[in-house]
């Protein structure tokens, strides 16, 4: 994933910063506890597509 794109992207819900988890192929918003998938190097920034994180952040 392009580093410049990561600098621009924010959470669509809270507008906070995202953490890139390469191994899981997702972008994580810690305040919202959501993980947005990355498919074919394209981040899917839709709330309906996001995965809810567990209490331990996984």
UniProtKB/Swiss-Prot annotation:
Pfam family, any one: Trm112p
Matches recorded under InterPro entries: Trm112-like
GO cellular component, one term: cytosol
Segments passing through the bilayer: none
HAMAP family reported for this sequence: UPF0434 (MF_01187)
Family listed: Belongs to the UPF0434 family.
Protein name: UPF0434 protein Daro_3207
Organism: Dechloromonas aromatica (strain RCB)
